Every structure is written in C-alpha cells, then in structure tokens.
Amino acid sequence: HYQIGSIMVRILSFTDRPIDRTFWHERLKAAYDMRLALHLANSDTTNAYRLVHGEGDNLPGLIIDIYRNTAVMQAHSPGMHYARHLLAEALKEVMGDKLDNIYYKSETTLPYKAALEQENEYLLGGVGEDTATENGLTFHVDWLRGQKTGFFVDQRENRALLERYSRGRKVLNMFCYTGGFSVYSMRGGANLVHSVDSSAKAVELVNKNIELNFPGDSRHQAFAADAFRFLDEMTTEYDLVVLDPPAFAKHRDALKQALRGYTKLNAKAMEKMPKGSILFTFSCSQAVNKDQFRTAIFSAAMQAGRHIRILHQLHQPADHPINIYHPEGEYLKGLVVYVE
C-alpha cells in the first residue's frame, strides 16, 4: 500500500489476508456500526457525519462523509484510489437503501508525485448538491464545488456549544465558509450576527443557509473581506467572536510561521472585544499541537493587553476517532476563552 510523500507506508492489516471486497466490507461495516452506536447514522436530527476517518477507522488514506443519502469519498493515497470501485460496492452493501449516491472527490487530495490523472466522478448515482441536517438545522451542501467534501462536519459539537453562549450577544464569525457557526448563533438568540469570508462564493453560501433556516431575519449580514483588514477596520463591539481559519501549517516546516499567524490573528480580535466577551478560537493544523496552540493564544492576550481565562478546551467529535498509534489523527483543537 505504497504512498508517495511524507508517509512511507500505510498499514491495512497485521495479518496475512487478501485485501479484497470482503476486507473492505468488514472495515466499512465496523465504521458504520460505530456511527450507529454514536446515534449519528440513525439520528432524527442529524444526517451529516463522518463515516470513515482514515487511520481512526483502520482505513488509512480514506475519508468518507455522509450527507443524507450521499457519500463523498476522498482518497489520500494511491492504494485507496485503486480500490475505489471495490470500496463503493462494499459501501453500498453496508448502507443499503440509505445510500443513493457516491461521489469520488480526490483530484486535489492524491499525492501529486503519484502522477495519477484522476477526475472527480460519481461511482454511484449522480445528484449534484443537496441539503443536510445537523442538530435540526438545514444546510446546503455542494460537494462538487465546495471545499473538502462540501461541509465541515468536524465542528458539529462546537457549533452547538456556541449556540448556548449566543443569546443577547453580537456575534462575529470570521472565515465563515458555509456559515455553520452563524446559523447556530441565530438560533441561540444572538442580537446581531456578522459573517466574514474572503470568498464571495462563501458569502453567498452563508446567506443562503441563513435564509434557509431564518427567512427574512434581518439580524444577519455577511461581508466578503480579508480577515486581518476587517479586524483592523471594524468598529462594532462584538462580544462573541469565532476564529476558525484554514490550516496555517500543513507541514512542520511552516510551524513557526503558523504560530505567529495564530498569535497575530487572535491578538487583533482581542484588542477590539469589550470586557466580558467570549472568544471561540480554533486550529485545524496537524502540525500545531494543543500546547503550542494554547501558548499562541496566551501570547495573543499578552500582546493585546487582555486577561483571559479558558472556559472550554475543544476538539473533534466522536465520528472523527483517533487511532492510538496515529496521534496525528487528532488535528482539530480549539479554546473558548473569557476575555477581560
């Protein structure tokens, strides 16, 4: 199972057995059974979740996210790419009539050195986009043109936590993308919600999701703007801020630069936040560990001249399990801090 890149080898099994359709069926069924145990695959309020989280589900190099009756599959290694058709057949067997579409989206995730000329394609069905439900809220999911698999299911529990703190607050959601945090804060009773993203398409999408859940609600406004410039120029005193940027460090070589970026970003936000504010801040960079991220946030508070206290230490949800032999699978870390 050869991988061209920084990972020398990915291990599928420690026993001598054929890697065939039966093997894939067993692994996918184990992953599905766990999501049933987590009350995700059989939930009345959520139908967007991660079915396969690479090494965490003993399927290294494979990601599968479920959106209602569609599976979006990403291969991160040539081995999983070559097995895609067997995987699709096994997945349909496991999920049965709960699955109508399988979209294979690996153009940008396969190692470029592998020289695999792969176009994204349907392995089953062919629906272009759909809506998915998360904790009773509805979101447009466009796996054809959207980032990653179309939606960030890893923030589900953290969005629900934000909802609890939203009542009566002025919320700023930076790097909003689909606007998940914005939609939850609207339901939580925020007085005002502003969503910011550098992408005009993201702004269009967050507005679409707000209208889908809260038609005609004037509390929300979205802006297409550079994050640092927006923070420099903003005059509204937001007392609940979400900073969920894209990965600042995808490789260890970029670690120092990434930590400086997190410090700068969080310091700019803290400088403008009134006393008694709450900051949700995240890093999805594998190369940045929890201690390094926390140190960057403490440094940001010092630069901003603010005193902060940690209210919550956040991470990825249970449908993103971590293999004890693959600690890198724990990539999402976050802090909720009280700013004084």
Describe each PLM feature range:
Residues 1-68:
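Non-catalytic accessory regions of SAM-dependent methyltransferases
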Residues 52-65, 81-152:
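Non-catalytic substrate-recognition/targeting regions of SAM-dependent transferases
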Residues 168-177:
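Conserved class I S-adenosyl-L-methionine
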Residues 178-191:
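Conserved SAM-binding loop of SAM-dependent methyltransferases across substrates and taxa
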Residues 192-197:
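Conserved SAM-binding motif I beta-strand of class I
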Residues 201-242:
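S-adenosyl-L-methionine
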Residues 224, 238-268:
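Mobile active-site "lid"/loop adjacent to the S-adenosyl-L-methionine
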Residues 278-340:
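C-terminal catalytic and target-recognition region of SAM-dependent MTase-like enzymes
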